[in-house]
Structures are given as C-alpha cells and as structure tokens.
C-alpha cells in the first residue's frame, strides 16, 4: 500500500503504535480513505474536539525544536509538574533559550496538600530552577482544573511577553496538553481559530493559538524524559504516577532495619538511625506495606504482582528489576523517585531507596 500522510501535520500515517507520530485507528483510516481526508488521531481530535494530545519526540527532533525556539524573539513558557519537578526539567533548556525570557509554570498545584502555601512552593521552584541553571523572569503556579489559576497564568504571560510570540515547552506527562486546552477555552472558546504549522526539518507540527495583537502562542510537542516512572507502566496504572486529587501525606514511625514497599513500584529501607517518622507523599491509592528489612528482597519476589501491586501479575514479567540507591541523610530531605512521589526524611538516617532500573532517584530540599 502506498504511504499515506496526515493532511493536518504531514506525519506518515500508521496504525500500530498508539504513542507514535501519525497514529490513527484502523477504522478511522478506512473512513478517511472513503472521504479522501486522512488525519492522524492527534490532528483529528484537535480539529473536531479542540483537544490536544501528547506526541512523542525523538532526541533529534527535540534539538531542532529547541533551536527554533532559541532563534526566535519570544517568551518561553516552561511547564513543569510540581509533583515531579526533577522528572520534568528539560535538560539543556537554558543553553538553547539563553537569549529568551523564561516563565516557569508549576502545573498541578492542586495535587499538593492545601496546607502548603503557594508562596513557599513558588520560592522552592525558583531555588530548584537556579540549581538547574535556569533564571526564570517569574514563577507561576497553576492547574488546568482551576479557572482562576488559568486567568492568573494568562495575565503573567501577557505581562512578560511584551507583544512577542509565546512558545510553550515541557516534557510528556506534565499536563501541558490539558493546560493548553484550558488556555484555548480561556482565550476564545472557539475551536476554529487553532491552526498547525510544521517545525523546520521535522514532521512535527506546532499548534498555533492566535492572540489579539497578531502574535501567537505556539504549543510544542512533549519531550520524553527517559527516567520517568510513567514509561514503565501500562495506561491503566498511569494513575499512580499522575495523581488527580490532593495527595494526603502519611507518616510512618519506623525502627532501623524496617522496610516500606511502595506497591511493587519501589521500596524504602531504613538501615540505621534513631526511631523516627518518615512522611510518604504518593498517589492516595498506592498501597504502602511495612515489613522487616531482613528478607525484604525475598518478600518482594514472592508478592510482587499480588500483595505488592502495581505492577499486576501480567505486567510484572516486563517490569524492570528494582535497583538500590544508598544514602546518608543529615536533615530534612525529600527522597524522590522520579515520577512516582517522595519520602521525607526528618532527621539523621542511613537509608536505601529502590527504584526500577532506569528510573532516577534524587534528593532535594523538602517541599512540604
């Protein structure tokens, strides 16, 4: 069969890989061939439902995209996930957009406990950004579910863009598409104003949302961050790494040589130190299980996919082995499993954090 291309974005049409560029279901392809209008699923949803979905990029495409952003005189809006800051930082962004103003947007602010003040989170995000070599002109917290937060975000964008175009960038799974959909609703409510154009040298489209003064907001495709937990889970279990509701941190009083299993997705060992409380911040539905450190590995091997889930009994065959990261902690510190959540250590302790091979474990100043 001759190769078909999406008439929206130009990507080659394929029916195998749902996550890949140019995907369309077989039934939709057959309908498209009848009407002579073949769209990939992403463009179809954009055209008919005003709905933007994530698309996965190769590193090469990503570099081309960043070059274009860096070469333009524009405001760069960098969306990060407050729940997973380390997993949502774009490596090398400051290098590429050095001449542009960057507005840092902490998304999913409604996931953090209400007791945490916005000002504290904003300050914390600015500190983390500086550690990553970024110098944002401003930090704003938002949530696609909150209309007034979207209004605040639009006001900040207007304040800092100074008549320029705006590029929205972010990795996959930070909720960028949902946020852009909320922005479109806020600006217009009219789906016919959105157009797409091609990134130079790629088959990737950027979504164009016109502003009143003839400038545009450009939404760019989401960049894959390879060390996020999301890449190791099936669609059904993604909810554990992208909570939709306010997380309720739980504190566990642990003695040395006790272990806490995070479903079957990770593990926390308290190796040495005074008995103390450790505060776990994960999706509320993720079941945590306390046991003795001695024999914990055998316990995991026996119960993963059953008592310790996700992964379920089918998924566990494909799920990567857990790898230990030993750490000595001196004061209040978050131990983060990229894309899953974190455990706050409140005092001196020798600990080990186990995460699937390939998933990053990082320490940071406590956020809560």
Go through each PLM region and give its residues.
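A short alpha->loop->secondary-structure connector
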Residues: 94-101, 189
